[in-house]
């Protein structure tokens, strides 16, 4: 492993990419400590701790604070991080599955992807502006102590909205530069850095919680099993053999090759969990606004009804998103169009039904896995009775991005005849 890292720095291009990525991440981490203008930082720290202890929103705040790398707890210019961009990307991907014009745009090659990326940035600006205004205004209005002396709520809202929106767009630009000049996907790297930066605070929470030896062993075992399970499921796929018919033109023979169609167990990544988290938080938000104690207790984070609805939503969205990004009808049509077929099946309807059946079976495993990952923090907290946010979702993102980084570094090193991180086999990057 250490020899592989040494080899990586022997390749000038790879060394420059690694250094650029580290410098970009330093800039990202510095920005997290810059508060928005007009904020009473000390008062906000007390307010955040008080809100985080509220039964209905504790899990939601912890989940979001992990994604922002702790920026929310500091109410910094990077408070929204790249979440508006992720939301915009998901919305446009879903629209592309039902709007022929967007679907055709994605099929136009590089130019189409550039146009799609431009639409994503515009939607990010719109969503980011609305989100920044809503967060700034609602928090300042309900907690006027967080506003610095001499600044009214309206002034703070304007300053905070502009600062957070500028922070999001800067991170979007920084992520694109990392993709272009660094290692891995820039947006994923920023989220990865934010998640990993929170791990020391998790360990500190566990230490201050006074865990005994047995509870420490349980906590470490859960973490190791979770990481192993994530790697296993992230890499798992069902391969369907595709055979292409041979064509003879003159003295040349075309086709006749055999390949495979991969169907990943976890097609949607963390997107089903993000969708489910957004929906399941609505009753808690309504309860907080209306101050309805019955609704607060009913949909308390970690309560039976909350976990039941959360789990069912994750299960549903896993199937829903799998069908969106892997359309059996479209794929069977493409196989037939290019002269391919699945051995033992007729092209067309039979192939489509077979792909649909395999997709359902494979997705079931992925859906059960994501439900366990989503509910893991609440199950661990219930077992050891300590408020330690061991997030399966954050681990899923961190491990996925780490695998992608290793795969890219491996490719650079193998191309230049250096021994990589893996001596046998090959890690597949996320698609």
Swiss-Prot record:
Any GO BP annotation: protein transport by the Sec complex
Intramembrane residue windows: 74-77, 78-84, 85-95
PROSITE patterns named among the record's database cross-references: SECY_1, SECY_2
MF terms in GO: protein transmembrane transporter activity; signal sequence binding
Membrane-traversing stretches: 18-32, 74-95, 121-133, 162-178, 183-198, 214-226, 271-283, 303-315, 368-382, 390-403
Periplasmic side: 33-73, 134-161, 199-213, 284-302, 383-389
Segments in the Cytoplasmic topological domain: 1-17, 96-120, 179-182, 227-270, 316-367, 404-431
Membrane-protein topology: Multi-pass membrane protein
Subcellular location: Cell inner membrane
Main location (coarse class): membrane
Keywords: Cell inner membrane, Cell membrane, Membrane, Protein transport, Translocation, Transmembrane, Transmembrane helix, Transport
Function: The central subunit of the protein translocation channel SecYEG. Consists of two halves formed by TMs 1-5 and 6-10. These two domains form a lateral gate at the front which open onto the bilayer between TMs 2 and 7, and are clamped together by SecE at the back. The channel is closed by both a pore ring composed of hydrophobic SecY resides and a short helix (helix 2A) on the extracellular side of the membrane which forms a plug. The plug probably moves laterally to allow the channel to open. The ring and the pore may move independently.
Assembly information from the UniProt record: Component of the Sec protein translocase complex. Heterotrimer consisting of SecY, SecE and SecG subunits. The heterotrimers can form oligomers, although 1 heterotrimer is thought to be able to translocate proteins. Interacts with the ribosome. Interacts with SecDF, and other proteins may be involved. Interacts with SecA.
Family: Belongs to the SecY/SEC61-alpha family.
Protein name: Protein translocase subunit SecY
Gene: secY
